[in-house]
């Protein structure tokens, strides 16, 4: 296939605006998917956690054959926490499809990824999706997107963008919202027409940059990237140059292209194509592969600095080793080193003792996805409260700030604004939609937002929507930020909890455990109704007497206890507390 028949595009969207569904429909209608995948939804999100959370974490590649052209499509994560993924992906493509919801319009994460695309000089194609939603307002959305591009400093070509309307769920698209085709073909035709073929030289010596890695126990490390010059064949000798400019020899075993979602071995790949290669050990992201006769490194890829850190430590609670398989500091260290290979935005440093590691990432979500993965792989660990990473600039302490958009019902506006004020947030904008809901935009220091999400859901009775995205590093705000108001109930005994004592403890606060659960000394068993910590005994049984009672036993009714998810537990703990994470349970304890 000649270069002129090749198109490389990335799909950008805010969380939940439907980009993974859109790719599904393109795959089905172009006839690229086989029968077994035809029925399943969101084929692209193949990771367990992606299916459960309904978000995309890892960037994926796929390709579609359409009218004798090949379109390589890369799906990117919308969360700013996975920004490390987004930047690498954009280095492989020539244009982006910006997907925006026809009701919500552009959201903060859309802005984050669009800024990255503009920095790379890519021209966008706007897809206004979910056009069939009640309350769709495509003209308003179009104006909003134009204003956004203008604010981000787009040039004339970027501001003169093509627009197409679609409903990915129904699998239809059209250049006019009133006149939709029966399928997605207008979108595919628009991509062929508006996206330039890759500007590369397929005659020169080989040059290719690795922009993503995968691992497979059968072939080892798999490098994914786009060939910028020349051709590559299996069993070819290459020189690998890493970001420190040191060179070593290597041999490529297999060369694989994409067909739909599957990787297929190809006899040769040429410049402009996105491919995977195997056979070279210890590949790193942003390594350059080149022909031994002409050694030239490509500029290294940049990734945003981490903003949040946590301490991972060996689980040293009395229950250590009961539920997990990997519990030693060596297991922990090896697992974190393995994660560093393909998780670019992660940093790991040795802590203040051999069994502690300081792990930094792009946000709470980024790190909690890693902890959840480790938990599923039978690891046990203790995790401290998330902290923001501060920097010193010209003798002043700077901290990360985030832009937050909150969508709530009018009646909750007062309590949310008061809480945000205590967390040192500045209100930037506010627009009521006239139907009983209001949209608030804040700029707030990240350390004030740790632990806000769970109280926000309680405040709005679960009806509020909140999205946040890293904005910049700015001068740190003075003064203490709002902390947890209540103390905790700490167990001072170690056996099974009993309903009799839990029933009597209910007057003191909300319990985190039910009847018949094993506890240990120092474990947090509930939330105190006052602001101090209280040692309690949840294992006390009723004293038996030898006098026969005539039905004087009271009927013990326990209020349902609070069960924390991993994210809620991380947000709940204070500086002197830990979250104990094991494959079977999540416990809170004092250090």
Regions flagged by a language model, labelled:
Residues 16, 22, 54, 73-75, ...:
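Residue-level signature of catalytic and energy-coupling elements of molecular machines
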Residues 123, 133-193:
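Canonical P-loop GTPase G-domain recognition
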Residues 208, 215-220:
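A contiguous, basic/glycine-rich beta-loop/short-helix subdomain that forms a polymer-engagement track
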Residues 1-100, 104, 144, 213-216:
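P-loop NTPase switch module centered on the Walker A-proximal segment
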Residues 35, 107-108, 133-139, 171-176, ...:
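Switch/connector loops and helix/strand junctions flanking conserved nucleotide-binding motifs
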Residues 10-11, 127-135, 172, 176-180, ...:
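Conserved short loop/turn motifs at secondary-structure junctions
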Residues 86-100, 105-149:
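Conserved P-loop NTPase nucleotide-binding/switch module
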Residues 162, 189-193, 197, 223-591:
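Accessory interaction regions appended to the cores of large information-processing enzymes
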